[in-house]
Structure formats: structure tokens, C-alpha cells
Amino acid sequence: MKKISNYFKPYKGLPLSIYIIFFASIVNNVGNFVGPFLTMFLTYRIGISIGVVGIIVAINAGLGLIGTMIGGYLIDSIGRKKVLVVFGVAAGIGYGLCAFINDPIIITIILMVSSFVGGFSHPVYGTITTDLTEGKQRNAAFSLNYMALNIGFSVGPLLAGFLYENYLMWFFLGDAITTFISIALVFVFVPETKPTKVEMEKSKTKALESAEEGSLLKALIKRPTLLIFSFIIVIYFIVFSQFTFGLSIQVGDIFKNNGATIFGSLMTVNAVLCSVLTVFITSATKNIKAALCIAIGGLLYALGFGMMFFIDSYYMFIISTATWTVGEILVATNTSVYIANHTPITHRGRFNSVFPIIRKLGFMIGPMMAGFYVKYTNIRNLWVLVAALALIGSLMMYKLYTVDKIKVEAIQT
């Protein structure tokens, strides 16, 4: 028991607000009913054609990203909690209203508006986590955020599916209520963390987090390391996007009629491992720099996805999934840490709003690239390309790690 408790040591002694955000995030993610079922709702419940639904879903995602960008600026300008309360509550009200409206056009418009205003509050949790932590505590705190996401998404879709089929009104009300509960937890128990002028002055002693004046673009230009990092992470997400695209095609190609069942089971393996292993991996890597962890994650992507070039058995697919899942945990928990450690104290909200766009970009390019490549070769050859990209990304990340190490040593001397 003592050995097991040692794995939880990194999570002890964190600020109370971090634990509140952890529970608030679980509640919010468990109640994320509408998003995952939006396509199904618009197609089968409202009766919109698939072509139009595709356009609506794309616009909905775009509005959410625009809202996130604007929200990042407001978070830095007026404060974290104000943005969360005003725009988070507005989004929740929108979802709640859909429970009592029958007009499909009005429902569609409300859902799109809710996605837009809800996007404003998306960077809040990450920004507060950055404000309240530094060093090893920051690794543990972002690891908790990642666990909350996985716990929520392990339970949420099951509950959402049940409500969608049997109690549609509560499908919308449940999303709204869990949104309100999560916001209430943060509003009551978490203080405003927007840096004061004194804290901004103190930040000048931290070369990588010192205050900056001007726009997000100006701050990025002054930090070329973050620009390079953003490019590398796009490569990582191009690779990672194949867990839904390339993997589903290969499993269907090999297992035919059982393909959907086997693909679903591999997704379950991924979800369970993400929920269970995060604590142990965070503890094992607590003394390793975020950049190096991400580089190791890239190697595991190369191995886990690359081995699909030659495997055929279900059990080998489980091993493959387990391998790239460990890589996913390393990349996901340390990417936020790296961004936080290199973000000026004055621009934390804006920098936290950029990451979802980087992720979306990778997930947009990945399937398109893979589809084109497979069209002219075959599905197995895709994994050679994916493994090569993962290796390139990993090597670039390791180079970034060495550059950062030299910079830190120069500052300390």
C-alpha cells in the first residue's frame, strides 16, 4: 500500500483551488452531452440532410474556436472568473432552452450560439492552473486536468446516450445543470487569479514567464521557441489523429464485419489506460522536463502506430494501442506544462486559447493527408509515413529540449 501511495505524492500539497477545478472539470465533462451527439441529433431527431449537417457541425466547431480566441483575450483583460461565469452560464442557458423548444431552426441557431459563447470560457481552467502553480506542482496539476477529462468522457457518453434515447429533455437540461454546478464550484471556492501589478513585476525574474506588452502575435515573435513548439505539436496531432482515421480503416480491412466491435474495444482500452496510468506515469516522470517527456511520447507514437504496418492479430492491436496510449499521456499532460512554462504572465489566457486551434489543425490535416496517401498506396503503407513523422517530431522536440536546457543554464550562470 505504501508503494502505491507514493505514486499519489505529486498530487499532495497542491493549492485547494486545483482540487476544486479537478472536480468541477469532472462534473463539466460528465455532463458534456450535446457536443458528442450533435451530428446524430441534427440528422435523426431534427431530420436535416447529412450534407447540411456536415456544414452546421463545421460552422459550430469554427464558432467555438473563434469564441475561444476572443475568450483568451478577455481572460487576460477582465479576469478569469468573470469570463467563466458570464459566458459559461450563457452557454448553459442556451442548452437548457433547447429542452423546451420544438422548432428545429431555432434549436440549431441556439446550439451554434451556445457553442460560440461557451468557447469564451474554455481556456479558463488551464489559465487558472497556470496562475496557481509552478515547477513540479504544475506537472501534477495539469495531470489532474487530463484525468478529469478522461474520467468525464468515460462516463458522460454512456449517460448521454441513455438520455438521448429515452429522455431528450433531460439530455439538454443535464448538460445545462452540470455546466452550472461546475461554474458554481469555481465561483464559490476559487479566488480570482488574474496577476496583480506586483506579480507582474516579480515575473521579470523569470525569463520565460516575464510580462510582455502588446498582442499575442508580438509575444509569440519574442518567443520563437513557442512558435517552433507549435509547429512540432501540429506534427504530433497529425500523427495522433490516425487513432480514429487510419486505425478504424485498418481494423475494418482486417476484421471485416467484426471491425466496428474491435475498433470500439480498442477505444475502450485507450480510455481505461488513460484513466488508470496517468497517476503512475506522472509520478514516474515528475523529475523529467516537459519537453523531454513529449519527445519520449513521440517515440512511443512511432513505435505504437508504426507496428501496425505488419500486425494482424487482435492482441497485437491491443499492444499497439497500449503503446501509443502511453505516448498520448506523456504528450497530453506535458504539452500544457510546456506552454505554461514559456508563456508571459500577461498573456496566459491568450496562449491557452491557441492550443485548441493547434490541435484542430492537426486533426484537420491528418485525415486529409492520410486519405490522399492511402488512395495511391494502401492502408499499411500509411503507418510507415506516420512513424516517420512521429520520429521527426520527436527528434525536433528533443532538440528543443536541449536548446531550452542551454538557455536555462545560461540564465542561472
Identify the meaning behind each predicted range.
Residues 33, 61-69, 153-154, 271-279, ...:
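Residue-level signature of mid-helix packing/kink "hotspots" within the transmembrane helices
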Residues 82-96, 292-306:
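Structural signature of the two symmetry-related core transmembrane helices
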Residues 112-151:
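Cytoplasmic helix-loop-helix junction between adjacent transmembrane helices
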Residues 164-177, 372-390:
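A membrane-interface helix-boundary motif in multi-pass transporters
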Residues 186-201, 399-411:
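Helix-loop junctions on the cytosolic side of multi-pass membrane transporters
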